[in-house]
Amino acid sequence: MLPAVGSVDEEEDPAEEDCPELVPIETTQSEEEEKSGLGAKIPVTIITGYLGAGKTTLLNYILTEQHSKRVAVILNESGEGSALEKSLAVSQGGELYEEWLELRNGCLCCSVKDNGLRAIENLMQKKGKFDDILLETTGLADPGAVASMFWVDAELGSDIYLDGIITIVDSKYGLKHLTEEKPDGLINEATRQVALADIILINKTDLVPEEDVKKLRTTLRSINGLGQILETQRSRVDLSNVLDLHAFDSLSGISLQKKLQHVPGTQPHLDQSIVTITFDVPGNAKEEHLNMFIQNLLWEKNVRNKDNHCMEVIRLKGLVSIKDKSQQVIVQGVHELCDLEETPVSWKDDTERTNRLVLIGRNLDKDILKQLFIATVTETEKQWTTHFKEDQVCT
């Protein structure tokens, strides 16, 4: 693992990492039967951010404050970990396993040293004792890979859904992390975390001048033009801003429609050239052709920009009009996975059907992507490459 960047004051405040008061869980069948909504799906929110940004501080706040929320928190930090982690990681026969503990405010907590999937599977046995799940990633983790496991794990599919991705950024060291150069042209972890976020928390704003916060906010917006940016101190935030986001399901259709109308395209402020682009194309798309468009971008990664660089899409979101469907369809793409889902919103007879997409990624060319989408909407599967010069198709 790479060491944390910066001096000692970048680390979490030890006082913030004190282990909260714990009581053993004693779950009985009658207690669980008393809980309502046992058949409902449980939302999972991914908490990510660079080392020392304030993830553990946020989770400790949620675990100790009185907020009437029953939240299950999975701490998933590698290495030495915090005081809270050390108290929860239990060793038996030389192997670490997770132990769920219940806190005085009704929250549940455990610590794991893997991707957290097994912990969530075990957590489902306690269904009825919590309403939300927060999953912390390691500081160097790609949240896209973590998010994708909730789309592909069939056993969990009927019990949980991905609610959103929260990225915490250190206001003092954020720019340094975002501009860190990686070998072989790779996107650094901090930038990818910001690009994938639905909510971006600029933390520790009380430690830097206001001008530095503004500069960081501008840089974050240049990377991710879709996510909401909030400023915090000591990771304290209204839970309504991090829970029940519905960022990945059809319930977000109405709010997404309004949001997409105001998403600006961005210009790169960093060497990585991560930008947000958006475009509108009127008409209907055939679902199989739309899937082909997404496959070329997310899986094959075989389209080049005008500078002959392969485009890399990190996050894709939009509302599209599918031929022969009366409902608007939300399209989501993260980490080579994509999903189409009908929303409750119907197309009005007197309104022109249109497709509006927002893509976040590197080396993106709006004109080429829009041209590719138009070809996908109006022409057959084998004709799309004829709209590009041979050197514009990655091989």
Curated annotation (Swiss-Prot):
Q: Where along the sequence do coiled-coil regions lie?
A: none
| Compositionally biased tracts (Acidic residues) | 8-20
| UniProt-listed Enzyme Commission number(s) | 3.6.5.-
Catalytic activity line of the entry: GTP + H2O = GDP + phosphate + H(+)
Residue span of region Disordered: 1-22
What residues does GTP bind to?
A: 49-56, 110-114, 203-206
Listed SUPFAM superfamilies: Hypothetical protein YjiA, C-terminal domain, P-loop containing nucleoside triphosphate hydrolases
GO molecular function ontology, one term from the record? GTP binding
Q: Does the keyword Endoplasmic reticulum apply?
A: no
EC class, as a word, reads hydrolase
Subcellular location, in the record's words? Nucleus
Q: Which GO terms describe its cellular component?
A: cytoplasm; nucleus
Q: Which family does it belong to?
A: Belongs to the SIMIBI class G3E GTPase family. ZNG1 subfamily.
Protein name, please? Zinc-regulated GTPase metalloprotein activator 1F
